[in-house]
Amino acid sequence: SSCKEEEEEVTQSNPTARVQVIHNCADLAASSVDVYLNNNLLIDNFNFRTASSFIDAPAGEDFSVSIAPSSSMSSAEALVSYTYNLVEGETYILVAEGIISTTGYSPATAFSIEVYPMGREAASNEGNTDLLIHHGSTDAPTVDVVETGVGAGTIVDDASYGDFTSYLELSTADYTLEIRDASGQVTYATYSAPLLTLGLTGASAVVVASGFLDPSSNSNGEFFGLFVALPAGGDLVALPVAK
């Protein structure tokens, strides 16, 4: 009947936004979690340093994202829950990070989900790789990222915990990234960013600073590194320490 047809049309036109979730919480208590969208299990046994693919999420209405232990049976067991209202047609990057435990971590920066609302699923120019860089290491200071391989210089200036850069639109090549202190004088670590070798021509990706500079003060959690989340999701790709 016509009534039924109208219902179907309403169902088809539900507005959506695109969302990728990245697990960057280095707290051992959250090494694997369940993620619920409203009360539905979205990601089962979501492991540290993995990402979802981009998924459709409801837009224009409040919905909840809940993080629960990997053994959870329902969202009622959530450790934390957040409410979002997304803009139709927009693309969002969500990064889960921080500390859930009450002891064993210094600093014990509170768990949060950081949101970047202008995400990309591909590069804006097919010859480039678009990188979004995010500082998600709880015990790392404010840093600069300096490219020394092709001489691009300071590509990130004074990034503090929780910060996102805007997208860096880079010619797809193999780069060398130095993590320096805010003065730019002290180099903490140097990484290869082999965008060409990784086959990222025309792709976008999120680079997260992850883990602990001082694991001994953080329950011997995973050591600091730069990790790449690809649009297809899956395990984050560790950028190798430069030789």
Residue ranges and their predicted role:
Residues 3-243:
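Intrinsically disordered, low-complexity polar regions and short flexible loop motifs
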